[in-house]
Amino acid sequence: MALDSAIKLEIISKFARGEKDTGSPEVQVALLSRRISDLTEHLKVNVKDHASRLGLLKLVAQRKHLLKYLKKTDYAKYSELISTLGIRDR
């Protein structure tokens, strides 16, 4: 399930470091978090959709790795990001 372009641009503009930044870890984590929440809502309705469940697990793992990298390189941005997105600190 892809994100709508308007939603994607809104998330990118909110978390981007610069004007044309789309690849920083903060932006990637924010986009993944939105996709994860959308997939979670989808799976509440479609309980037997196991392919989407596997996709969700892959997205969560990817976000976990990006958060680990961000925590290691810039802890201040990491703590700000998880508080903004409402993600637990592990």
From Swiss-Prot:
PROSITE patterns cross-referenced by the UniProt entry: RIBOSOMAL_S15
GO biological process: translation
Keyword RNA-binding carried by entry: yes
Gene Ontology molecular functions: rRNA binding; structural constituent of ribosome
Keyword line: Ribonucleoprotein, Ribosomal protein, RNA-binding, rRNA-binding
Gene3D superfamilies listed in its UniProt record: 6.10.250.3130, S15/NS1, RNA-binding
Pfam families reported in the protein's UniProt record: Ribosomal_S15
GO terms under cellular component: cytosolic small ribosomal subunit
PANTHER family: RIBOSOMAL PROTEIN S15, BACTERIAL AND ORGANELLAR, SMALL RIBOSOMAL SUBUNIT PROTEIN US15M
Subunit field text: Part of the 30S ribosomal subunit. Forms a bridge to the 50S subunit in the 70S ribosome, contacting the 23S rRNA.
Function: One of the primary rRNA binding proteins, it binds directly to 16S rRNA where it helps nucleate assembly of the platform of the 30S subunit by binding and bridging several RNA helices of the 16S rRNA. Forms an intersubunit bridge (bridge B4) with the 23S rRNA of the 50S subunit in the ribosome.
Family: Belongs to the universal ribosomal protein uS15 family.
HAMAP family: Ribosomal_uS15_B
UniProt-recorded name of the protein: Small ribosomal subunit protein uS15
